[in-house]
């Protein structure tokens, strides 16, 4: 049984946020993380491709081509990076774009790699230009070109590197420079999960946590998880708390529904912030079109928060449209709130 008593994460501002809420939540994610491609649920196309590329690299005794994983947060990019290293039977070194401030930071990592090791850089779109320039020859030729000294005494030193695999992860592939993007031989986009796969993930997590949970309870959690395993596992922990107090730890569909309703997560995975936004568009602006600034003023949120946090899921699920004239509620939004559809 996993020991999780001291790993319970504090509830984030939005329980349906896809970002990791805390260090404690990250620790629990690691405990629940699948270790092999066979255990990894969902992302069938990416998983099938990686399995073939990994087997081919091992068969030839070569380093795997550099891998770029992109897609919304919480879908398993970090998990896949760990699995790639595990399947290759090599070490994984992990860092993130913002941490690599100077060329020396990257050089220290690269020169300590063993042959065929995996270097995982999360948020790779946030690499500084200086570090990115150093990375190019390392990716192409397994070589570092570093300037030592300053002024007339400066000289270039070339350092040979062992063959290695860079796995880069990003939620914003469009922010990668073309030269960096072109150096990845394998590019995989991770998609939002189907409810069927999320139900399997919730059931697996419940089993690891030794929870008394039936399939209907897992389905109830899955369908409110916004297609995101990280959210599913977070909701599962809160449902577990509710079941421990209200139903002797037994989680069925009714208990899951009651727990998630108490948390203001409705049957479509919308929370208070989502509903507040949609209700403003529907009731205050007649369903739209309405400008972003007007909606932001009406609900007391910044335009950045609306664009980056609220709107993506609503658009992806078909509750909202962005048009040249502004935001418009869709037919699905009217039906969700029990309103007559505007013609």
UniProtKB/Swiss-Prot annotation:
Residues 194-264 are annotated as: Small ATPAse domain (RuvB-S). Keywords: ATP-binding, Cytoplasm, DNA damage, DNA recombination, DNA repair, DNA-binding, Hydrolase, Nucleotide-binding. It is found in: Cytoplasm. The keyword RNA-binding does not apply. Residues 4-193 are annotated as: Large ATPase domain (RuvB-L). Mg(2+) binds at residue 78. DNA binds at residues 322, 327. Its EC number is 3.6.4.-. GO terms for cellular component: cytoplasm; Holliday junction resolvase complex. One of its GO terms (biological process) is DNA repair. SUPFAM superfamilies: P-loop containing nucleoside triphosphate hydrolases, Winged helix' DNA-binding domain. Residues 267-343 are annotated as: Head domain (RuvB-H). The keyword tRNA processing does not apply. It catalyses: ATP + H2O = ADP + phosphate + H(+). Gene3D superfamilies: 1.10.8.60, P-loop containing nucleotide triphosphate hydrolases (3.40.50.300), Winged helix-like DNA-binding domain superfamily/Winged helix DNA-binding domain (1.10.10.10). Its main location: cytoplasm. HAMAP family: DNA_HJ_migration_RuvB. The RuvA-RuvB-RuvC complex processes Holliday junction (HJ) DNA during genetic recombination and DNA repair, while the RuvA-RuvB complex plays an important role in the rescue of blocked DNA replication forks via replication fork reversal (RFR). RuvA specifically binds to HJ cruciform DNA, conferring on it an open structure. The RuvB hexamer acts as an ATP-dependent pump, pulling dsDNA into and through the RuvAB complex. RuvB forms 2 homohexamers on either side of HJ DNA bound by 1 or 2 RuvA tetramers; 4 subunits per hexamer contact DNA at a time. Belongs to the RuvB family. This is Holliday junction branch migration complex subunit RuvB. The gene is ruvB.
């Amino acid at each position: 049984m996993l020991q999780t008593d001291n790993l319970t994460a504090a509830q984030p501002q939005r329980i349906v946020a896809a970002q990791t809420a805390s260090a404690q939540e990250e620790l629990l994610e690691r405990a629940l993380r699948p270790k092999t491609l066979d255990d990894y649920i969902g992302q069938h196309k990416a998983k099938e491709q990686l399995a073939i590329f990994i087997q081919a690299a091992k068969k030839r005794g070569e380093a795997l081509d550099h891998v770029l994983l992109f897609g919304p947060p919480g879908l398993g990019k970090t998990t896949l990076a760990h699995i790639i290293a595990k399947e290759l039977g090599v070490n994984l070194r992990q860092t993130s774009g913002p941490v690599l401030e100077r060329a020396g930071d990257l050089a220290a990592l690269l020169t300590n790699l063993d042959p065929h090791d995996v270097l995982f850089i999360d948020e790779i779109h946030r690499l500084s230009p200086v570090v990115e320039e150093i990375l190019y020859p390392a990716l192409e030729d397994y070589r570092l070109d570093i300037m030592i000294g300053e002024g007339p005494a400066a000289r270039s030193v070339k350092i040979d590197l062992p063959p290695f695999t860079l796995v880069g992860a990003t939620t914003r592939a469009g922010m990668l420079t073309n030269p960096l993007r072109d150096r990845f031989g394998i590019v995989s986009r991770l998609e939002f999960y189907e409810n069927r796969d999320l139900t399997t993930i919730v059931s697996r997590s419940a089993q690891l946590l030794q929870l008394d949970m039936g399939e209907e309870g897992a389905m109830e959690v899955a369908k409110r998880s916004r297609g995101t395993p990280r959210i599913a596992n977070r909701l599962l922990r809160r449902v577990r708390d509710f079941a421990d107090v209200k139903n002797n730890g037994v989680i069925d569909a009714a208990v899951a529904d009651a727990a998630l309703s108490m948390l203001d997560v409705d049957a479509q995975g919308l929370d208070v912030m989502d509903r507040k936004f949609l209700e403003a568009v529907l009731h205050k602006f007649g369903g739209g079109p309405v400008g972003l600034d007007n909606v932001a003023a009406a609900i007391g949120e910044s335009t950045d928060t609306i664009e980056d946090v609220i709107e993506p899921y609503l658009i992806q699920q078909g509750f909202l449209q962005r048009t040249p004239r502004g935001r418009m509620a869709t037919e699905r939004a009217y039906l969700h709130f029990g309103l007559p559809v505007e013609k």
